[in-house]
Amino acid sequence: MYAIVESGGKQFRVEPGKVFFTERVVGKGEGEEVKLDKVLMVKTDDGKVLVGKPYLENVEIKGTIVEHGRARKVIVGKFRPRKNYRRIKGHRQWYTAIKVEEIQVK
């Protein structure tokens, strides 16, 4: 069984027991339970496919926050030829790792 869920403006394929990385979830700490209710699609174990318009009302995904962290640094540079102008800036994006516990189809 797997589901397509929307979190942080992006879509993820999630399965029970697997961990996925999304934008930082504010207000929740490590070890706390989260419920993902923006479920776009579910494929059950018996091959049945449920598609939402845009979301499924009767599906709930429960997960646990594994960790909050920051991704690897992305280096961005600006350069102007012949003007002796160079700027380098780094950015590290916050993320939250969520382990999916179960997918409930009501």
From Swiss-Prot:
| UniProt cross-references to InterPro entries, sorted A to Z | bL21-like, bL21-like_sf, Ribosomal_bL21, Ribosomal_bL21_CS
Might you name a Gene Ontology BP term for this protein?
translation
Q: Which GO terms describe its molecular function?
A: rRNA binding; structural constituent of ribosome
The keyword Cell inner membrane appears for this protein: no
Which family, according to UniProt? Belongs to the bacterial ribosomal protein bL21 family.
* Alphabetized NCBIfam families for the sequence: L21 (TIGR00061)
Q: Which PANTHER family match?
A: 50S RIBOSOMAL PROTEIN L21, LARGE RIBOSOMAL SUBUNIT PROTEIN BL21M
According to UniProt, the name of this protein is Large ribosomal subunit protein bL21
UniProt organism field: Thermosipho africanus (strain TCF52B)
